[in-house]
């Protein structure tokens, strides 16, 4: 029964990552600049979660200390998305994704530090292996050190908010967490707009209005590609290790490329490097549950002995 539940959880996780892979396509379809996009995405998401909470008749009441903790994580999420888009602007998509590949490696150190446990050697090794897999796929370009540095910061923030969400998921419902985090991310993005536009977009005018089908793509992005996967991911953190989730998340660009080819008919060819890099990541993702199970068995034997 436990194995069946775990397999189901991992299949759900892969489905969520497939949905997140679709966000890259939506990003191409939406005409809004990056931070305005983050603002509308989080605004729509927070309203959508509020509607779900209303129909489920769940409570939104939290103590002030709990509220500060959850909304603090929401600010980290907003900072992660902002630095992610900034990195892509400073460098290239491949450099940005190469930096983001370090998320699982950061998690291997942050999770034990936050939870006061020992660092697991195989998590560090798998984190490094996944980085090599993504470097093979995207063939990292040198000369973009500032963009890479910002991407590393974004990856650190992603690892940090994931680990903190793992702790919050033990005490609060996924919908409570998602609502307040999306609300905080939305408010922080709104406060950051003047600074972001002045520093990172050559002082362009803030673009509030959308065009053509932007409203539809924003609704899909905010509701289907954010509310559902974010809430379910928080729920999965109650049962799956945060490292395992972040390790599997490295398949998002792979799924995104495949979906882009299928849906948009992208001209990019699936090179041998793509298949080799994907294989490296897949092996890392698939071997982690085995190593984790082996580690738990070894500890159990030591305890009994």
Segments and roles (model prediction):
Residues 1-39, 75, 79, 83, ...:
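Glycine-/small-residue-enriched transmembrane alpha-helix faces in small-molecule transporters
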Residues 2, 42, 214-216, 250-305:
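C-terminal-most transmembrane helix of multi-pass membrane proteins
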Residues 10, 97-102, 165-186, 226-262:
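Helix-helix packing/entry segments at the starts of transmembrane helices
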Residues 18-22, 26, 52, 71-86, ...:
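Hydrophobic alpha-helical transmembrane segments of multi-pass membrane transport proteins
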Residues 25-28, 49, 107-109, 144-203, ...:
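Transmembrane alpha-helical segments that form core, pore/gating elements
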Residues 32-79, 102-107, 159-164, 179-199, ...:
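Transmembrane alpha-helices of multi-pass small-molecule transport proteins
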Residues 49, 71, 119-138, 271-292:
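Hydrophobic transmembrane alpha-helices of multi-pass small-molecule transport proteins
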Residues 53-56, 103-125, 254-275:
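C-terminal transmembrane-helix exit sites in multi-pass transporters
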């Amino acid at each position: 029964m436990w194995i069946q539940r775990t397999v189901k959880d991992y299949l759900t996780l892969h489905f969520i990552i497939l949905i997140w892979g679709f966000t890259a396509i939506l990003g191409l379809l939406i005409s809004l600049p990056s931070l305005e996009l983050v603002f509308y995405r989080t605004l729509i998401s927070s309203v959508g979660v509020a509607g779900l909470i209303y129909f489920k008749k769940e409570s939104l009441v939290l103590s002030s200390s709990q509220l500060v903790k959850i909304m603090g994580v929401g600010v980290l999420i907003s900072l992660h998305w902002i630095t992610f888009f900034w990195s892509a602007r400073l460098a290239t998509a491949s450099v940005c994704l190469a930096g983001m590949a370090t998320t699982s490696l950061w998690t291997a150190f942050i999770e034990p530090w936050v939870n006061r446990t020992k660092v697991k050697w195989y998590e560090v090794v798998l984190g490094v292996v996944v980085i090599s897999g993504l470097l093979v796929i995207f063939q990292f370009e040198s000369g973009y050190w500032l963009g890479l540095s910002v991407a590393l910061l974004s990856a650190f923030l992603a690892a940090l908010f994931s680990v903190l969400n793992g702790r919050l998921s033990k005490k609060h419902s996924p919908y409570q967490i998602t609502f307040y985090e999306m609300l905080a991310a939305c408010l922080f993005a709104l406060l950051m707009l003047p600074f972001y536009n002045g520093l990172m977009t050559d002082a362009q005018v803030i673009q509030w209005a959308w065009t053509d089908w932007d409203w539809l793509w924003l609704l899909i992005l905010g509701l289907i590609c954010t509310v559902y996967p974010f809430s379910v991911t928080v729920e999965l953190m109650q049962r799956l290790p945060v490292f395992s989730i972040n390790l599997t998340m490295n398949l998002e660009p792979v799924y995104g490329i495949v979906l882009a080819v299928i849906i948009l008919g992208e001209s990019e060819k699936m090179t041998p490097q793509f298949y080799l890099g994907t294989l490296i990541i897949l092996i890392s993702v698939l071997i982690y549950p085995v190593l984790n199970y082996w580690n738990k068995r070894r500890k159990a034997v030591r305890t009994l002995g």
